[in-house]
């Protein structure tokens, strides 16, 4: 019995040590500016848009409609966007974006309305 407890504790410590050493590097600053395409899936339907972003403004085209958003970076990998010309109450809500992982030309992100616990995910690819 004593051996099993010691073995379990040692295994748990080893597992904790190994997982804490793995920290995937995110190069979020590479994606603060540029031209991008975004893909997200909501309830089985795929949505694609293109956008151009500088440090504080994002201009997005979705299904031929152009929207402009203010961008406020809260840290290197998180930012909040808010529509500058909302047409309804839903478009007035700011959206919190968090970059989860990065590759050389793309990143995976998570987003939600500020204060909402329901999160969605998507992928952004930087265009050349």
Language-model segments: which ranges?
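A short, structured loop/turn motif at beta-sheet edges
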Residues: 70-78, 99-106, 126-128
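N-terminal glycine/threonine-rich, aromatic-flanked beta-hairpin/loop signature
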Residues: 46-74
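Bacterial signal peptide processing site
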Residues: 22-24
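Bacterial N-terminal signal peptides that target proteins for export
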Residues: 1-10
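An anionic, turn-rich surface loop/hairpin at beta-sheet edges
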Residues: 80-104
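Short, exposed beta-strand-loop hairpins at the edges of beta-sheets
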Residues: 60, 100, 108-121
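C-terminal motif of bacterial Sec signal peptides marking the signal peptidase cleavage site
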Residues: 17-20
């Amino acid at each position: 019995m004593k051996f099993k407890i010691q073995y379990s504790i040692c295994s748990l410590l080893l597992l904790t040590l190994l997982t804490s050493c793995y920290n995937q590097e995110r190069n979020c600053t590479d994606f603060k500016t540029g031209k991008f395409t975004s893909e997200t899936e909501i309830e089985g339907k795929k949505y694609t848009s293109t956008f151009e972003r500088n440090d504080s403004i994002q201009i997005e085209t979705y299904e031929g409609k152009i929207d402009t958003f203010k961008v406020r970076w809260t840290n290197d990998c998180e930012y909040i966007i808010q529509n500058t010309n909302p047409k309804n109450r839903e478009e007035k809500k700011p959206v919190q974006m968090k970059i989860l992982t990065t590759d050389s030309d793309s990143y995976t992100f998570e987003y939600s309305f500020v204060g909402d616990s329901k999160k969605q995910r998507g992928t952004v690819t930087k265009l050349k």
